[in-house]
Amino acid sequence: MNTDITFIIADNQDITRMGMHGYISAIFSGCRMIDVTDKKELMLALVECNDSVVILDYTLFDINGIEEFLIIEKRFPRVRWILFSNELSEDFI
């Protein structure tokens, strides 16, 4: 698999981040993973790795609504986003 991929795991729960590490490592062995626990850390990681894949727990992260997320998404157009949450609705998507 491609080991040039950088995954940014944006979640503030240790157990979820550990699970993501295990799952991603099983599929993309040797890839780079960066853990971030808040928006400030996420922004710093995106500046460093602006072509990464971000796995974001949207509900538990400190992004203030869809408008703010869309601003971040537009600022980093090469980033691919995977959002997960138990509260995402069809309207959101």
What are these regions (language model features)?
Residues 39, 53-72, 88-89:
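Conserved phosphotransfer microenvironments
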Residues 92-93:
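Receiver (REC) domain alpha4 helix and immediately following alpha4-beta5 loop
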Residues 37-53:
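Acidic, metal-coordinating helix/loop segments flanking the phosphotransfer/catalytic sites
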Residues 3-15, 20, 24, 54:
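Conserved acidic segment of CheY-like receiver
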Residues 47-49, 72-78:
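Conserved phosphotransfer cores of two-component systems
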Residues 30-38:
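Short hydrophobic/Thr-rich beta-strand motif most characteristic of the beta2 strand and flanking loop
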